[in-house]
Amino acid sequence: EDLFKFRVNWQKALFVFDELERRNIDYDQICLVDSSFMYKWDAPNFFELTDHRFTAWYDKDNMRWIHDSIQGYKDFFDGFELDQSKYVNSGFIVFNKKHKEFFQSFKEMYYENVDELVDLQDNIVKKGTEQTPMNYWLQIKNIDVNLDLPIAYKLTHMHRKELFGHNWQTDEDKTPFFIKYGYNWCFNGLPKDQRSDIMKQTWDLVKDKYVISPPDTI
């Protein structure tokens, strides 16, 4: 497909079920995650917190950006009044087979309006990719969304919250706050020319913690 019209963030939402079927992957729940996230090695299983509902978190880190994005797409969605208090971050979402129809309709909507959506994205709204259109579609389709993930699973804009720092009163432990107290680390809001390096530094700090246990001998 044309990567100008079908960018990676759109692809993950449009083709997730197609890809699972193509690879013949069985599943109970699906977690769709942006590449800017890292998940802590010993974090509790978030799949146990979903109640088998569409699960995401309420995004309130950049309210002006969100407001402008919502207003920018409002006319496209026929003036639909989106409830900003239910606006979610699409970088980490969990869903299951009962949401297949939702994603299929989202894909159909995109295919039918791809040129207009690309123009809105690049020339008018200039705020993100699929996140705000997905929020509109979630509310238009009246999808039940679980917003109750604990805060440790949604560490975003970590530099603004001073989570890269550590407790200066204990010289023996210089573990950054986000590693010490968080489960799901999102390296968003950073200058793009710094993000990869910061993620690499983080990986070098923790990579030895990710040990894959060998299967039991049969």
What are these regions (language model features)?
Residues 1-218:
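Glycosyltransferase catalytic domains, chiefly GT-A lineage
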